[in-house]
Amino acid sequence: VRLGVASYSLRNFPRAQAIEMVKALGTPYINVKSVHLPYELMPDELVAARREIEAAGLQIVGGGTITFGKDTDEDVRRYFDYAKAAGMPVMVATADPAILPRVERFAKQFDIKVAIHNHGPEDRRFPSPYDVLKQVRNMDPRMGLCIDIGHTVRTGTDVVRAIADAGPRLLDLHAKDLRDLTAKGSQCVVGQGAIPIGAIFEQLQAMRYAGYVNLEYEIDPDDPLPGMQQSFAYMRGVLAGLAVRRRAQS
């Protein structure tokens, strides 16, 4: 399981500072939000920004969340052009279900994966991973899910089972923790809440999940680094514990 950062966690900081903060977390993997790579940048500016990120030793493993708002080739292509110039192998996205066949066509054309993100009870289109799965299960394999574990548990869904049921359609995962599994406002440092992080990681390993677990730390926006560092320490500790257990069993 590879741990990365969703740069939305660092939304109150400019790109150069966000890069330094990701480096401080000791991971090379970053899922970039448009606040750090604006959609309005010209292709050459996007390439330059991508080089700036890569020169710092970081790897762009995805971007988003990107909203496909219009069911037109022009609008959908704009975001794929953006993702291509930025070197994003995966676009974490949301869209009206009616737009997804068009998105699928561009995913095939550009050979870029699209991971539809579920946003919990407030999301009328995709509250839970199963709502995404229903839409993408017969589409091209590049169409899949980004399971947000915090939003998922708030729908009452068994998050470990949802990960298992998504199988190879699981393309990305947003990690966070909640003290109260029904309350969005109860987000906390990963490991201090009630989300079963250990069972989630165990399931990801059992299915040989090839994507990334990106920390999306939405609290403390003006000083997120201490909580993010604690979250990473906890997640690394869980992975180390699982590795020890695997060695003991073998």
Model-predicted regions and their roles:
Residues 1-15, 33, 62-67:
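Boundary/entry segment of secreted carbohydrate-active catalytic domains
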Residues 31-54:
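Glycine-rich, proline-tolerant flexible connector loops at the mouths of alpha/beta enzymes
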Residues 1-3, 11-28, 126-147, 153-250:
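Histidine-acidic metal/acid-base catalytic patches
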Residues 16-19, 36, 52-147, 153-156, ...:
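Active-site acidic/histidine proton-transfer and metal-coordination neighborhood
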Residues 33, 66, 94, 176, ...:
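Conserved residues at the C-terminal ends of beta-strands
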Residues 35-40, 66, 184-188:
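Vicinal oxygen chelate
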Residues 25-34, 58:
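Short, conserved active-site loops that position catalytic residues or coordinate cofactors/metal ions
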